[in-house]
């Protein structure tokens, strides 16, 4: 057929799969993503502690960024028994691809001016769990806000979003269902 595409390419799906493969994260795993310098203010520690409380042990916490607390966070993850599910990537130039592979965005900062990472996550369509601070509380309307030290609240918010996200994906955007629909519509 001249000029008619008979296949559908979803770049975001493939880039997300590439990142998961590179990081050793199973394709069926849930991914919680944080982006930012690994320092005390960014408070990634609370994300690691929340991961340890999640019932779904097939959930990974990916932190994109580098900073002075990388080793301390690795040690904390090991001590909580989640060292194999916490990934500190260091500095990355392909952060946009990380948003495509994540299921939930976690922004646990103690303080922030204009939270660019939250805006990027929202623009990528990710549900956001963020601290109730200036900036993020103005932006986050679909997601959950919590106090920076509320580990249980963060864990519960992540689980709630994962469950609702899984239902949405299954019902609305299963890639195989979309491909079958496209084949039926175009008779391919």
Question: Regions from the language model: what does each represent?
Answer:
Residues 3-22:
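Acidic anion/phosphate-binding donor-loop and adjacent secondary structure
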Residues 30-53, 68-74:
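A conserved mid-protein helix/loop that constitutes part of the nucleotide-sugar donor-binding site
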Residues 143-151, 160-162:
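Conserved acidic donor-binding segment of nucleotide-sugar-dependent glycosyltransferases
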Residues 127-130:
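Short hydrophobic beta-strand element within catalytic cores of glycosyltransferases
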Residues 32, 47-51, 61, 154, ...:
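A structural motif in glycosyltransferase catalytic domains
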Residues 91, 110:
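Aromatic "clamp/platform" in nucleotide-sugar-dependent glycosyltransferases that forms part
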């Amino acid at each position: 057929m001249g000029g008619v595409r008979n296949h559908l390419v979803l770049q975001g799906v493939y880039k997300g799969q590439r990142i998961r493969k590179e990081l050793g994260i199973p394709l069926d795993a849930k991914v919680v993503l944080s982006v930012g310098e690994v320092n005390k203010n960014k408070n990634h520690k609370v994300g690691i502690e929340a991961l340890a409380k999640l019932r779904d042990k097939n959930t990974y916490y990916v932190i994109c960024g580098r900073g002075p607390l990388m080793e301390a966070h690795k040690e904390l993850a090991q001590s909580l028994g989640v060292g194999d599910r916490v990934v500190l990537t260091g500095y990355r130039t392909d952060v946009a691809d990380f948003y495509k592979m994540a299921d939930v965005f976690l922004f646990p900062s103690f303080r922030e001016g204009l939270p660019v990472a939250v805006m990027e996550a929202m623009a990528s369509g990710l549900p956001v769990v963020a601290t109730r601070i200036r900036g993020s509380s103005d932006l986050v309307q679909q997601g959950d806000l919590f106090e920076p030290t509320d580990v249980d609240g963060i864990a519960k918010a992540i689980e709630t979003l994962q469950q609702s996200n899984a239902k949405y994906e299954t019902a609305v955007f299963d890639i195989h269902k979309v491909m079958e629909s496209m084949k039926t519509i175009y008779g391919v």
